[in-house]
Design a protein with these regions (language model features):
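Structured mid-to-C-terminal alpha-helical surface segments
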Residues: 1, 12-15, 27-245
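Glycine-rich beta-strand-to-loop/alpha-helix junction loops that act as flexible
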Residues: 4-7
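Anion-coordinating catalytic cores for phosphoryl-, nucleotidyl-, and glycosidic chemistry
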Residues: 19
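Structural signature of FAD isoalloxazine-binding scaffolds in flavoprotein oxidoreductases
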Residues: 22-24
Length: 245
């Protein structure tokens, strides 16, 4: 199993914004994978650090490659445990529940690499993660395929800028595999940097970046860098996109 998604990018690689879910991927397809047997071990580990929580596996109403579960805990109590600032504790309602969504991809697209990362908090430990070019491929797949029926996900575009500003190339083979799996690309067709830029340009032209700005403001402290966001800005920075096969 490997860590991926925006939380992996924040925790392991220094993305400077808040994130929501904990996303993991199996290393190969496992149709019968079930998160439930892991619930007790996760709750026991959290309790070892003083956190009292419950974990419920989501019952799927339709066939899906994603296994989901929610870790739930009393928000105010956990803030006291971690010695949060007094004003944060007092402003938190005593009945407020914190929910952390955990998802596992049980049928990951091929053509990705992993690496081992080491962290020191809360204790020294290692964790397997998708590499940055593969994480970037996953983010672009999300940008191209996410169904924005409620709001524009500005944090996706924020991450896109982060990858470009850090000169991270996108793994084209992994991205192609993801697009094919989502029925967003014909596996018989060639896929290269030109096709990718065309797809991104099409997405940019139909994106409301004013709404994207509203969304990202929930995830970052300083919004000044988003003042430049516009269709023209994102079209221009496509020229800096790097790829690997």
């Amino acid at each position: 199993m490997a860590f991926y998604g925006s939380s992996a990018l924040r925790i392991l690689y220094g993305l400077n914004r808040f994130s929501e879910d904990l996303d993991f991927s199996l290393l190969s397809k496992e149709k019968n994978f079930n998160l439930t047997p892991f619930n007790n071990a996760i709750i026991k580990e959290l309790k070892g650090f003083g956190f009292e929580a419950t974990m419920d596996t989501k019952i799927k109403n339709f066939d899906s490659n994603i296994e989901s579960a929610f870790i739930k805990a009393d928000s105010k109590k956990q803030l006291i445990i971690i010695d949060a600032l007094h004003n944060i504790i007092t402003s938190t309602h005593k009945m407020q529940i914190i929910k952390i969504k955990m998802e596992v991809d049980t049928n990951p697209p091929r053509s990705f690499d992993t690496e081992t990362k080491f962290l020191f908090q809360p204790i020294p430990f290692s964790i397997k993660s998708l590499t940055l070019p593969d994480l970037f491929a996953g983010k672009i797949h999300t940008l191209l395929c996410r169904a924005w029926t409620i709001r524009v996900k500005g944090h996706d575009w924020y991450d896109f800028v982060w990858y470009l500003s850090n000169n991270i190339p996108v793994n084209l083979q992994h991205l192609k595999a993801r697009l094919i799996q989502s029925n967003a690309w014909d596996k018989q067709l060639h896929f290269n940097k030109i096709e990718l830029i065309n797809l991104l340009a099409q997405k940019i032209t139909i994106t409301d970046f004013a709404k994207a700005n509203e969304d990202i403001s929930l995830f970052i402290k300083n919004t000044e860098s988003m003042a430049v966001w516009s269709k023209e800005f994102f079209i221009a920075i496509l020229a800096t996109l790097q790829t690997i096969n």
